[in-house]
Amino acid sequence: MITDPLKTVHVVGGGLAGSEAAWQIAQAGVRVVLHEMRPARMTEAHRTEGLAELVCSNSFRSDDAANNAVGLLHAEMRKLGSLVMRAADANQVPAGGALAVDRDGFSAAVTKALAEHPLIELQRGELDGLPPSDWGHVVIATGPLTSAPLASAIQALTGEDSLAFFDAIAPIVHRDSIDMSVAWFQSRYDKVGPGGNGADYINCPMTREQYEGFVAALISGDKVDFKDWETNTPYFDGCLPIEVMAERGAETLRFGPMKPVGLTNPKDPTVKPYAIVQLRQDNKLGTLYNLVGFQTKLKHGEQSRIFRSIPGLENAEFARLGGLHRNTFLNSPKLLDQQLRLRAEPRLRFAGQMTGCEGYVESASIGLIAGLYAAAEARDIALAPPPSTTALGALLGHITGGHIETIDAGPRSFQPMNVNFGLFPPLESPPTHGADGKKLRGPDKTVAKKQALSARALADLDGWIAENLPGAAAAA
C-alpha cells in the first residue's frame, strides 16, 4: 500500500493517457496510485476492465516517421520509453504502412506492465468529485467519457464555458495549399478585430451554379452515423453540421456561414459572388486555416471530394477533416498552463483527450508529457518543455496556447486536434533542391519539407532528452 501523499502522484483514469502517465511517473522513481472506475462503473463504450482499452479503431495510423506527423510522434514516444508504443509494437497486426494492434493483446500488455510495476498501485472505483485536497499531485486523464459527477465537479471549478461535452469540428487546411490566385484576404466589412488588420480571412467566391452544385453535394453526400453512445448528442444551432443547414433550405447557407455580404473580390470587383466560403486563421504560426462554419458529419472521403469543389481549394491539403462527436474536453489554452496544470488549482494536471488532443497516439503522448512533468514536480526538479519543433512540443504548444480565438469565433472555438505538420514552426531554410540538384516542385517539394521537419524534430528531441532526461537518453 502506498502511503506517502507528498511524494505520490494520483492518476485518475486508466485509458491510454492515464496508463502512459502512470508508467512515466513510476519509471522516474515516483510512487503512483492509478484510479480506474471500471469495472465498478462501466461506460457506454467500454466492454472490459482492461487498462488502455481501445474502444473504436485498432489503428495507431501511419508509422512513417519521415513523412507523417503521427509517425514522427510514434518515434518520439519510443525514444522516451513509452509503454503504449512498446505494447503496440509487441501486439502489431498487418496493416500496410500503418501501426495497427490486436486490441485485446495490447490492453492486456499495458495492464500487466502497470500491475507488475513495484511503484504502481491500481485502485478500482469511481472518483465522484474533485480529488481530495490531500492529494498533492494529480493527473486527471478520464477521457471523452468522463463520468458525470467528475465532469460536473470540474465544470464547477473552472466555469460554465470551460468544459465541452461534444466537439463540432470544421476542416482545417494547410495555408500553402490554398490557391490565392482565386482567393483573397479580407474581413467582412474590413472589420478590424483584436490583433487583426481588416484582412484576416481567406475568401473563396462561388457563382450561383457552383453554390447550387455544392449544396446538392452536401445533401447527397454519405454521412457518418453516430455510435451507440453518441445517439443523444445534441445539435446546437451555433454548431449545426453544414449538411443539416443545407437540408433546411437552398438559401440557408447563403444567409449563414457562406453569406457574401461585406466582401469584394479584388480580382473582379464588378462581379458580386453569389456565395463566399471563408477560412479563418487557426494557429499563431499562420500555417493552418479552418473553414468557418463547416463542422460536418460527412464521411472523410466525401469531405475531401466536396470541399475541393470550392474555388481556390481544388488542391487543398487537409490538416484535419470535420466531425461531430460526443466528447469531454477543456478550453485548455485558457485553463491550463504550459505544464498542463489547472491555473485555478495547480495541483491538478490534465492529460489525454480531455486537453483537446484527438487520437489514440496524441492522447497517450500528452499523458507521457504530463507524467514527466508530474514526476519532476514530485521530485522538486524543474523540467523544460520539449522543443516546439518536435511533435510532442508542437502538440503541447497547440493545447496550451498555440490556438487563437478571434472576436467572432465564439466561446468554443478551441476544438480537438490531431498532430500535423501545420502545428510545427516553419523551417528556417526549407529544402529547395533534391539530391539530384534539380529544383523541387509540387509533391516532391512537399515531401522534402515534411522530411526536413521530421529530421529537425528528432535531432532536437535527442538534444532535449540528453539535457533533461539523461536516464532516458541512456536507455535509448
Curated annotation (Swiss-Prot):
Keyword Cell membrane: no
Cofactors, names only: FAD
GO CC, one annotated term: cytosol
Stretches of the chain forming a coiled coil according to its record: none
Catalysed reactions, as listed in the record: uridine(54) in tRNA + (6R)-5,10-methylene-5,6,7,8-tetrahydrofolate + NADH + H(+) = 5-methyluridine(54) in tRNA + (6S)-5,6,7,8-tetrahydrofolate + NAD(+); uridine(54) in tRNA + (6R)-5,10-methylene-5,6,7,8-tetrahydrofolate + NADPH + H(+) = 5-methyluridine(54) in tRNA + (6S)-5,6,7,8-tetrahydrofolate + NADP(+)
EC number of the protein: 2.1.1.74
Keyword Transferase attached: yes
Basic and acidic residues: compositionally biased ranges: 435-446
InterPro entries, sorted: FAD/NAD-bd_sf, MnmG-rel, MnmG-rel_CS, MnmG_N, TrmFO
GO biological process: tRNA methylation; tRNA wobble uridine modification
Subcellular location: Cytoplasm
Annotated region (Disordered), positions in chain: 425-446
Superkingdom, natural source: Bacteria
Molecular function GO labels: flavin adenine dinucleotide binding; tRNA (uracil(54)-C5)-methyltransferase activity, 5,10-methylenetetrahydrofolate-dependent
Keywords: Cytoplasm, FAD, Flavoprotein, Methyltransferase, NAD, NADP, Transferase, tRNA processing
Binding site for FAD: G13, G14, G15, L16, A17, G18
SUPFAM superfamilies (UniProt xref): FAD/NAD(P)-binding domain
Family stated for the protein in its record: Belongs to the MnmG family. TrmFO subfamily.
Protein's job: Catalyzes the folate-dependent formation of 5-methyl-uridine at position 54 (M-5-U54) in all tRNAs.
Protein's UniProt name: Methylenetetrahydrofolate--tRNA-(uracil-5-)-methyltransferase TrmFO
Lineage, highest ranks first: Bacteria, Pseudomonadati, Pseudomonadota, Alphaproteobacteria, Hyphomicrobiales
